[in-house]
Amino acid sequence: MKEELMKLIIESGCIKFGHFILTSGKESNYYIDIKSLITNPKALKLIAKMIKEESRKLGIEYDKVAGPELGAVPIATALSLETNKPLLIIRKKRKEHGTGKLIEGEISPGDRVLLVEDVTTTGGSVIRAAKILKEHEAEVVGIFVVVDREEGAKENIEKEGFKLYPLVLVSDLFEAAGVSKD
């Protein structure tokens, strides 16, 4: 399944070369534009199936699925549908109207939450989301990411007491594409 996912990433034109500023603030000569992939039903089904199977193999038990907006929302939604587990959406900032929530969906103390993300570089966005879940007394039982850029996310996430499970490492992706990230 990993090879199939890498093929879809490559065929979807997700790897872009040029000069980019990433969410982390880092500059990069390549960008993984996963949005074209996560708007593809076939890819979303595959990603959800992979996360479901990997989490089962690892013995990770969870009650709810969560993802930070925007990129992780389609992934979390697909996984919620695949597993029949309720969905949580972590907002980038508190709503300034209505309820002012940071989390959309029902969350209760003690909920075991599987967090998903599209791409990680330093892990800042997903760490923030995990901390918001912890503030609501939920337990983050694991973090799955579609592509890890291998630029410190795993180490930073583990320093915060969470575990990262990448479906694809960027080094494997570039090798499969037959290109260099330099």
Swiss-Prot record:
Pathway: Pyrimidine metabolism; UMP biosynthesis via de novo pathway; UMP from orotate: step 1/2
Gene3D superfamilies per record: 3.40.50.2020
Entry keywords, A to Z: Glycosyltransferase, Magnesium, Pyrimidine biosynthesis, Transferase
Entry-linked Pfam families: Pribosyltran
Residues bound to 5-phospho-alpha-D-ribose 1-diphosphate: 91-92, 95, 97, 117-125
Residues reported in the UniProt entry to bind orotate: 121, 149
Catalytic activity, EC: 2.4.2.10
Cofactor(s) for this UniProt protein: Mg(2+)
InterPro entries with a match to the protein in the record: OPRT (IPR023031), Or_phspho_trans_dom (IPR004467), PRibTrfase_dom (IPR000836), PRTase-like (IPR029057)
Keyword Nucleotide-binding assigned: no
EC supergroup of this enzyme: transferase
MF-aspect GO terms: magnesium ion binding; orotate phosphoribosyltransferase activity
Catalytic activity: orotidine 5'-phosphate + diphosphate = orotate + 5-phospho-alpha-D-ribose 1-diphosphate
GO terms of biological process kind: 'de novo' UMP biosynthetic process; pyrimidine nucleobase biosynthetic process
Magnesium among keywords: yes
HAMAP family: PyrE
Subunit structure: Homodimer.
Family in the record: Belongs to the purine/pyrimidine phosphoribosyltransferase family. PyrE subfamily.
PANTHER family per the UniProt record, alphabetical: OROTATE PHOSPHORIBOSYLTRANSFERASE, URIDINE 5'-MONOPHOSPHATE SYNTHASE
Function, in words: Catalyzes the transfer of a ribosyl phosphate group from 5-phosphoribose 1-diphosphate to orotate, leading to the formation of orotidine monophosphate (OMP).
Stated name of the protein: Orotate phosphoribosyltransferase
Gene that specifies this protein: pyrE
